């Protein structure tokens, strides 16, 4: 998600929502999603502006979430509480993410060092569902649950390359790229060519697209029908690795790990659903 972006609480136009759609629930979830590394705490008016609600509606949702233990308040500023972590951990364990994904990610890190992640496409963003790394400081931290613009990551570009032409056209027509670094590609025509090249090559490389100091190589994880359901990457520090070095040294291992994961998820129906398109 690009900095300053307003949270879309439904992801659908009003006339596309099911009759049973619960607006109040969507508002509450939207408020939880509005807190991130850039907005760790906010006033009532800031929350309302981020989610696109009236202050009165935002206040009702915040009070409900506060009563349930998901949101805390310090003076006039609201923040998330640790109970929010239970929502993500329930998915992690019930879907088999730790059992299926983490072993291969740990093996890649043990073999090459640096970091390895798995992500899925959610709207215009890639969400990191598994991660392993050597413990070093990074500015853009790829922790489980982190959400970043798909156009600026190796994972995201692989996932975009896995879309059919109509879905890719729809994405490119809607996305409004933001320069996260001086090297971030924000021209939509250039992005299209990059994504089509990823589709042809079978892998994606990025250098300083999301943040300075991150060079990454990503490949697709495919389901039983051959469609891209997720992406896997290996990343290092710009200046210590190059895209060419990643391709030469890590691509075979990355492709093998992606194949193992793709075969393994067939044994976990929930994981298939989580990682499906």
Each language-model region and where it sits:
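Amphipathic alpha-helical effector-binding/dimerization core
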Residues: 79-175
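Short, solvent-exposed recognition segments
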Residues: 2-11, 137-212, 277
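Short, structured helix-loop boundary elements
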Residues: 21-25, 81, 94, 98, ...
């Amino acid at each position: 998600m690009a900095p300053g972006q307003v949270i879309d609480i439904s992801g659908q136009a009003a006339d596309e929502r099911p009759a049973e759609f619960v607006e109040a629930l969507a508002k509450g979830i939207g408020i939880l999603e509005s807190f991130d590394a850039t907005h760790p705490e906010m006033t009532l008016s800031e929350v309302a502006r981020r989610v696109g609600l009236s202050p009165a509606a935002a206040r009702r949702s915040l009070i409900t979430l506060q009563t349930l233990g998901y949101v805390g308040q310090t003076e006039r500023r609201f923040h998330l509480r640790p109970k929010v972590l239970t929502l993500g951990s329930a998915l992690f364990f019930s879907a088999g993410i730790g059992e299926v994904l983490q072993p291969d990610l740990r093996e890649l890190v043990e073999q090459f060092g640096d970091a390895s992640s798995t992500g899925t496409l959610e709207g215009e963003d890639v969400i990191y569902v598994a991660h392993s790394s050597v413990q070093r400081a990074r500015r853009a931290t790829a922790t489980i649950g982190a959400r970043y613009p798909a156009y600026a990551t190796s994972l995201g570009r692989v996932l975009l390359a896995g879309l059919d032409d109509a879905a890719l056209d729809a994405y490119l027509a809607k996305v409004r790229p933001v320069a996260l670094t001086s090297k971030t590609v924000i021209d939509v025509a250039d992005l299209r060519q990059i994504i089509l090249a990823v589709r042809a090559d079978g892998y994606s490389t990025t250098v300083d697209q999301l943040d300075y100091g991150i060079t990454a190589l990503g490949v697709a994880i495919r389901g039983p029908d051959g469609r891209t359901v997720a992406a896997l990457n290996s990343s290092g520090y710009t200046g210590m690795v190059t895209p060419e070095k990643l391709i030469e040294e890590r691509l075979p291992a990355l492709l093998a790990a992606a194949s193992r994961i793709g075969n393994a998820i067939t044994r976990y129906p929930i994981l298939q659903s989580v990682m499906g398109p």
